[in-house]
Amino acid sequence: MTVATYAAMGSEPNPSAFSSYAERRGCRVAYPCMLSATEAAACGQRMCMRAVAAGDASAAPFIAHPTRAFAATDIDSSRFPIVPAEALDMIVVPLVAFDRAGARLGYGGGCYDRYLSILSPTCQIIGIAFDEQRVDHVPTDAHDLPLPNIVSA
């Protein structure tokens, strides 16, 4: 099984316990890596997922600097290979706010909206949040995808 998660920034819910559990269960765990403008233009995505072996997260520059864009030459692709979107079985998604309809407000870059649209239909998509992030209504545009699953506490 291959799962994608993220390294929490600021006050985001921290999925590191989930990541550790997935690794112990033998799952391949991947993290988002922002792409340079040149590579984003070439593949139509601003973000990819890269596999990170258990215990190797501290060496992954895209985990230490999640908002920085990296060129392919900046990353050791044999150590941190790109995981094709269609290979993901599950993805854990951060969010700023959400509503009862599953609408998600992110940080405004549209990276996850674009990425979620290319996942396999069988991929489980799970947003995680604090209860305080629930709002009555999240304004959406045509490209915004609702999350089928949101877990909050």
Role assignments for model-derived ranges:
Residues 6, 94, 153:
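Conserved residues at the C-terminal ends of beta-strands
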Residues 9-11, 96-100:
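Short glycine-rich anion-binding loops that position phosphate/pyrophosphate groups of nucleotides
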Residues 77-82, 86-91, 99-103, 113-153:
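Surface-exposed, charge/polar-rich loops and edge strands
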Residues 1-87:
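N-terminal active-site beta-alpha-beta segment that forms phosphate/nucleotide-binding
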